[in-house]
């Protein structure tokens, strides 16, 4: 059951607002997984510059379970952030962030891909256990839809949005590896939305191979 675990590092995928609907994978399961792993560091999907912000601010921009983890564990374990929301916001509050306003669901091919993704979320992630949610075959299905979506988006002139998503994931990976490197020998649990799990785990594996570990 040591899914997505390598030596002292564990990557745990979460399902954001679906935790409120999925009785098999609630915040209690996240809490238990953290306690069971006994980490020295908890890395969550919040920008590190926002870690010290109040909940009233965070709740508008970040997944609820990330805020709950921060609130519950920051007084007993080191909690750090590894998210990224764009170069323009490097030292800016996140309220200046302007996500894409384009309504892309009006295009049938995009709409069909979004429906396929939503069906997986509804059929699987609303009922799966914490262990089933980390299942690689299901994550690969979502990844495949994302790749197809990017091809279609490119056809609608959305190259900037695709680049932003790629940059975000790459920098999240860089930030994660820096946290691990800066805390060499310590136990680190990385908590992220399920759609980032495969990428981050691959980055972790590659970094270990390069270090001949």
Residue ranges and their predicted role:
Residues 2-35, 49-51:
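Zymogen propeptides
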Residues 12-15, 45-47, 82-85:
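Active-site-proximal beta-strand/loop segments in catalytic clefts of secreted hydrolases
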Residues 15, 194-195:
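Active-site metal-binding loops of divalent metal-dependent hydrolases
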Residues 196-213:
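C-terminal domain-boundary segment and adjacent tail
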Residues 34, 38-44:
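Proline-aspartate-enriched helix->loop->beta-strand connector
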Residues 9-10, 186-192:
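Generic beta-sheet signal
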Residues 10, 80-82, 212:
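General small-molecule cofactor/ligand-binding pocket signal
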Residues 41, 50-185, 194, 202-203:
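Hydrophobic, often amphipathic alpha-helical segments used for membrane interaction and targeting
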């Amino acid at each position: 059951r040591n899914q997505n675990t390598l030596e002292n590092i564990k990557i745990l995928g979460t399902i954001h607002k679906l935790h409120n609907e999925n009785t098999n994978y609630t915040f209690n399961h996240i809490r238990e997984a953290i306690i069971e792993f006994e980490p020295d560091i908890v890395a969550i999907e919040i920008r590190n510059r926002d870690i010290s912000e109040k909940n009233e601010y965070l709740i508008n921009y970040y997944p609820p379970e990330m805020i709950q983890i921060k609130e519950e564990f920051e007084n007993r374990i080191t909690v750090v952030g590894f998210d990224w929301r764009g170069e323009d916001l490097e030292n800016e509050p996140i309220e200046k962030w302007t996500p894409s306003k384009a309504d892309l669901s009006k295009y049938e091919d995009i709409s069909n891909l979004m429906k396929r993704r939503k069906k997986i979320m509804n059929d699987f992630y609303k009922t799966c256990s914490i262990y089933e949610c980390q299942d690689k075959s299901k994550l690969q299905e979502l990844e495949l839809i994302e790749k197809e979506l990017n091809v279609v988006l490119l056809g609608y002139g959305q190259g900037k949005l695709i680049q932003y998503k790629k940059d975000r994931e790459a920098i999240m990976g860089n930030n994660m590896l820096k946290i691990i490197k800066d805390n060499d020998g310590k136990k680190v649990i990385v908590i992220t939305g399920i759609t980032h799990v495969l990428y981050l785990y691959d980055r972790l594996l590659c970094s270990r191979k390069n270090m001949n570990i």
